[in-house]
Amino acid sequence: MTRLSLQLIAGLAGQAWLVNSDTPSHEAFASCLSDASVPIATKGTPEWTQHTTPFNTRLQYEPIAVAVPTEISQIAAAVTCAKKNSIPVTAKSGGHSFTSLGLGGEDGHLVIQLDRMYNVELAQNGTARIQSGARLGHVAVELYNQGKRALSHGYCPAVGVGGHAAHGGYGMVSRKYGLTLDWMKDATVVLHNGTIVYCSESEHSDLFWAIRGAGSSFGIVAEYGFETFPAPEKVTNFGIVLDWNPETAPAGLLAFQDFAQTMPSELSCQIDVRSTGYTLNGSYVGNEASLREALVPLLGKIGGHLEVHEGNWLEYVKFWAFGQPNIDITPPADNVHLSLYTTGALTPSLSANQFKSFADYIAKDAIKRGNSWSIQMFIHGGQNSAISGPKITDTAYAHRDKFLIFQFTDFVWPSQEYPEDGLALGREFRDIITNSFTNDQWGMYANVPDSQLSSGEAQKLYWGKNLERLETIKAKYDPSNLFRNPQSVKAAARCATHPLLLQGQCLLF
């Protein structure tokens, strides 16, 4: 037996969940990985802590092993070994999941750490090949430097493009350019049996539909093909500190919502709420003069002082980088770690009464928790939003008809114990926002998952009307549910007819 195989066995020996009559031995799994020359980290190896410390330290899970491929053949080999040994598989790109789903969301997964696969290559026709381990900041820098091109994506430069694009990809130019997944033209995917397939609108089109909104449930996306657009010459970022109190905030929020219904597509913005008060900030694709003109109908109604920062595309990306001096993030790279809880909602427009309840919650409940929480209310839709253009069924992303995105985050530093009341505080906020809507009127963004949802609740809220089709595609491409987490898409039941059964009945198998 090779030295690598012996090291793997030693690392796997402490994984008690493997020791049962239904699971092959540690030795079989270790030997398979060793024979395939898959780079692996196991418990006790120097890289283990870096690979397995989650962004959210409140939710810590222990993988059985972490594969660290540098090429797609190694991904396929690792998946094949896991399949043979009945071990669930999870992809981890940037590792920023709020619920540690990149580690499986539970113990015992083989994690495919993709961050060593981060190549970005721009073709002369403006299309780009981007490996799933690339961080958003690196993607932005490479596309700009290679050809002054850009891709619509979120604003945290350390987030990996793999999961970001697989479930949406909202950012501060999304109303102008749509979600990241809207620019996807193809993908290279490793399936449950180790097969490598190419999918697009014309090849494996059902799989291509599914990975644009629910990608992590269907395979390991090793590489994306994206269309890109010319990087805007000017993007103007802005902020307005709002002098609102509990009495004036509801009217201000309603005025902002009314303005957003018809605001130009070049404008993307959010209301940010913390213990220090309300702030409106965002970005405008264009120069400062055009931004000021666009905001004229709003400023007289909400008050506050406007501050602006005009720059080029990369300056826009740096502006939203939370003070990080380097946005061109490549491995080895570590993440900030927090102990946190997130929840949220995608909703239609809110009523005046709902905004009153929102403001009362801030003033009477959230403010008591000090300064560790934040709430963002993003404008998702509106008459001029590119996000709203496609139909709900055009991709697996099911929220094209929603107007607002809410995100609640409550955190402490990893050295502190997460407070018992934090979970309840977040759920109360979500209930205030959603309790006036029927279940089919609101949903949740899969890139802002809620750890407190059951599997059934999560699937319905993340994928809504598209869930049934996703379940059917799951049964076709991952019938054994190898790619899973506690909130992933589950395969539709397969059945076979039998002559003794009544019409419409079936035998499950």
Curated annotation (Swiss-Prot):
Its cofactor is FAD. Pathway: Secondary metabolite biosynthesis; terpenoid biosynthesis. Diterpenoid pyrones display various biological activities and subglutinol A shows insecticidal and anti-HIV activities. One of its GO terms (biological process) is terpenoid biosynthetic process. Keywords: FAD, Flavoprotein, Glycoprotein, Oxidoreductase, Signal. Its EC number is 1.1.1.-. Residues 1-21 form the signal peptide. Glycans are attached at residues 125, 193, 281. Residues 59-231 form the FAD-binding PCMH-type domain. It is an enzyme of class 1 (oxidoreductase). Coiled coil: none annotated. One of its GO terms (molecular function) is FAD binding. The keyword Signal applies. Transmembrane segments: none annotated. The keyword Acyltransferase does not apply. Belongs to the oxygen-dependent FAD-linked oxidoreductase family. FAD-linked oxidoreductase; part of the gene cluster that mediates the biosynthesis of the diterpenoid pyrones subglutinols A and B. The first step of the pathway is the synthesis of the alpha-pyrone moiety by the polyketide synthase dpmaA via condensation of one acetyl-CoA starter unit with 3 malonyl-CoA units and 2 methylations. The alpha-pyrone is then combined with geranylgeranyl pyrophosphate (GGPP) formed by the GGPP synthase dpmaD through the action of the prenyltransferase dpmaC to yield a linear alpha-pyrone diterpenoid. This is FAD-linked oxidoreductase dpmaF. It comes from Metarhizium anisopliae.
